[in-house]
A protein has these predicted regions:
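N-terminal alpha-helical interaction modules that lie
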Residues: 9-38
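Short, Lys/Arg-enriched N-terminal segments with co-localized hydrophobic residues
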Residues: 1-10
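Alpha-helical adaptor scaffolds
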Residues: 23, 35-91
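Charge-rich, low-complexity segments
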Residues: 116-187, 193-196, 203-434, 443-450, ...
Length: 462
């Protein structure tokens, strides 16, 4: 009857309230006893999930997994089910499997703080350093097949080749972009993602000796002076027929680029702009484009002083050298100084007055409470961190002594730990009114901590 159905719903609500009350009080055994008292045949999806949660909370992760597997068909599109699967696998040290479930939970219910934190912790426990080594092991194991793909390209379906190679680059992270070409060239692509300029060079650095004489790996597209034709948006565009002008700003040390090509300029503005940027990156290379091109706009006619796109790379390099500037294509090689007004704030870094960095966007995000770059780096198993130590700011002379100590310690960490063991990069440092800071990008957090703690213990005064 309808009254019986209503009574069952009320009883279910009372049951849920009781279970939630016990869970909040950490009385998970009571939850287990109650739900185990219901026969499996009568336990629904929700009751089974709550029982699995209780087993997770008492550390019986294998039992939780068995229960969750029994409701997989319904659970795969459920946030809680995916979270609980990830939770059990995480505490069984099965981090890669756990990561896939937490990632799915995040897709289903974005921005849950617990899910995001578990994703971060999973990534840290699958460090970039070990991912890189796994990729190279895969590449060496499959080198013969990869060579055949280069030598007999016409015999391979491109989609099949891409899927095969994605098995290897997928060991590094999801959505790694690459291109494999003639002459055994393998090029990773940063696709405008700044953090990859700091990660991919290490990937190339770890290439096994057995591959070095034959294969040519690039951390990002290096550019070319050779012209070619590109099919895009139904157009066949010859690079020689794309005309450009580059105006140099010596204060900013960058270029504003304008372009004209009849077909490109007939496209809607967003399409034309996007198509040109693809061409420019291919010709200039991703490093030069990212470092030195600050603005791109199209013109409605061929203007005086314009020249063919293939000559742009040479023009930029010559202009920089003529102005006494060193040509540095990777942003990680360029350090800049910055000054800030110290703030009254108990949180670290808000006391900073002056610093230097080769990753300005990351430093900015520290103060914006923005984790975008932090999470993008974490996605690869790397970690942006800073070490801080307090000091007594009693005089300018004492501050100089502290600054000299920071420089010496940075040098020591870089030479003895980062360079020797390939554990990361020094990104810069800063001094504030209360603390000193050293910024790092780590390729293996656990490995770094194990090495750096004995060094830091040598300086008990800090």
């Amino acid at each position: 009857s309808i009254s019986n159905k209503i009574e069952n719903i009320i009883m279910d609500d009372k049951l849920k309230q009781q279970i939630n009350s016990w869970t909040k009080a950490n009385e998970d055994r009571k939850v287990i006893d109650l739900l185990e008292g219901i026969s499996p045949a009568e336990r629904g999806f929700e009751e089974t999930g709550l029982l699995a949660r209780a087993y997770n909370y008492v550390g019986e992760y294998e039992k939780a997994l068995v229960l969750l597997e029994s409701i997989r068909e319904v659970g795969e599109q459920d946030t809680n089910w995916n979270f609980r699967m990830g939770y059990a696998l995480y505490y069984l040290d099965r981090y890669k499997e756990a990561l896939s479930y937490f990632t799915k939970a995040d897709e289903l219910t974005p921005e849950d703080v617990d899910t995001i934190e578990f994703i971060r912790q999973c990534n840290i426990r699958i460090p970039f350093k070990s991912r890189v080594d796994a990729f190279w092991a895969w590449f060496v194991q499959n080198e013969a097949e990869l060579s055949r793909m280069v030598e007999k390209r016409g015999e391979y379906d491109s989609e099949t080749s891409i899927r095969f190679i994605e098995q290897g680059v997928g060991l590094i992270a999801k959505n790694v972009h690459f291109n494999i070409g003639g002459n055994y060239e393998f090029t990773f692509s940063v696709e405008g993602e700044a953090h990859l300029f700091y990660l991919y060079p290490y990937l190339i650095y770890r290439m096994p000796e057995s591959l070095r004489d034959k294969w040519h790996f690039f951390p990002y597209n290096p550019g070319t002076d050779c012209s070619f034709e590109l099919k895009i948006y139904g157009l066949d565009i010859n690079m020689e027929e794309v005309y450009v002008c580059a105006k140099y700003d010596d204060k900013r040390n960058d270029f504003a680029v304008s372009f004209y090509e009849k077909g490109l300029c007939s496209l809607p503005e967003n399409q034309g702009h996007g198509a040109f940027c693809i061409m420019m990156e291919i010709m200039l290379g991703e490093g030069l484009s990212y470092r030195y091109v600050s603005k791109v706009e199209r013109t409605d006619r061929l203007e005086e002083g314009m020249f063919p796109l293939p000559a742009l790379r040479g023009y930029i390099v010559k202009t920089l050298k003529d102005n006494g500037k060193e040509v540095l294509e990777n942003p990680k090689d360029v350090f800049v100084s910055y000054q800030l007004d110290p703030e009254e704030n108990d949180e670290l870094r808000y006391d900073v007055a002056i610093g230097s960095t080769n990753f300005s966007n990351l430093v900015s995000q520290y103060y914006e409470n923005n984790t975008t770059l932090f999470d993008k780096i974490n996605h690869y198993g790397a970690q942006a961190v800073f070490l801080a130590f307090p000091y007594n700011n009693i005089s300018a002379e004492h501050q100089k002594t502290i600054l000299d100590f920071r420089y010496a310690l940075e040098d020591r960490i870089e030479k003895e730990i980062l360079d020797t063991d390939g554990l990361g990069l020094l990104l810069g440092g800063a001094i504030g009114t209360c603390c000193c800071y050293m910024d790092f990008l780590l390729y293996d957090v656990k490995g770094f901590i194990e090495k750096v703690l004995p060094v830091l213990r040598e300086y008990p005064q800090y």
